[in-house]
Amino acid sequence: MRRPPLVVMAIVLLSGVAASTSAADTTTTTAVTTTTTTTITKTVPHRRVAALTGRPDPTAVTKRRSALTIKMDNTPQAHPQYGVNEADDVYEEIVEGGITRLAAIFNSNLPTIVGPVRSVRRTDREIVFPIGGVFAFSGGAQYAISSIETAPVTLIDQSNAGAAMFRDLSRPPPHNLFANAELLMKEGGRVHSPPPLFTYASRKVPAAGAPVGSFTVNFLSGFATSYQWDGKTRTWLRSIFGAPDVTATGVRVAPTNVIVMSVNYIGGVGVEGSYAQMVGSGPVEVFSDGRLQKGRWFRRNIRLPTAYRSASGKVIALRPGQTWVELLATGETVSVYARP
């Protein structure tokens, strides 16, 4: 872990920023027609493919910079958010009180406004350890900071970010801290390009699994998140708090893939100081290319990315694009609905 020297934070007041207010062991399903699965060939990202999305990277720009993970607020007061649609991958985790927060990982794009930015939690160490690079956050309790300090990342918070973090006074605190990803990346020191977190399928090979119209990740405390398949864009249209999830720039949040991992929260679900145990194995539901594959996730140690395998033991391959990973507590459910 490398942490830059502390400097006085420069607070930039952006009055012009828009201020619009805003898997599991048990799965509830309606009738979903299962089709014959086909083998998807495993592909490994090479120097012309972005490691964190599997998309073409003809200039290899993603190989010349580290990954940047920014901790984001996800409460109703934090919406609409900035920059989440430009992340390569996003992890959604449960924190105290059962609410969720996001860890958005940037490598392909470096938006000038990301946020709102919030504090670190112990689960973040589990997420970023194999990724490395830069981890940006607002601050945090000492136990959480001590945890993230053991990860191989450069830590940047509002005390040493300088102009890379700023407050929008048109929004109420603490939901008004934002970050400039490009400036944060410049504080990251030596480049450590990230490893691939997922296996991607060839576009020529049909997707495996049962066709799905929509599904809901049943987080507690009113944070249930729904996704609806859009065949035109081949993405999952995300909704939260009973409404479409739309960014502050008017873009619908629509990941290419959604992975729902069923994990144990050590210390209790929604309890302060608890964290998602992401080393070991557990049930997983993978939604990609309009289909669902059930299987298990495996992770041998914290330094390695998670592996995902189907019920038959085959590697689950994703469609290249943005991936969301939902860290659902063991015992919470996913409701799956057939296509109309």
What are these regions (language model features)?
Residues 1-8:
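Bacterial N-terminal signal peptides that target proteins for export
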Residues 32, 37-89, 96-340:
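A surface/extracellular/periplasmic glyco- and lipid-processing/surface-interacting theme
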Residues 8-16:
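Bacterial N-terminal signal peptides
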Residues 15-35:
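C-terminal region of N-terminal signal peptides and the immediate post-cleavage residues
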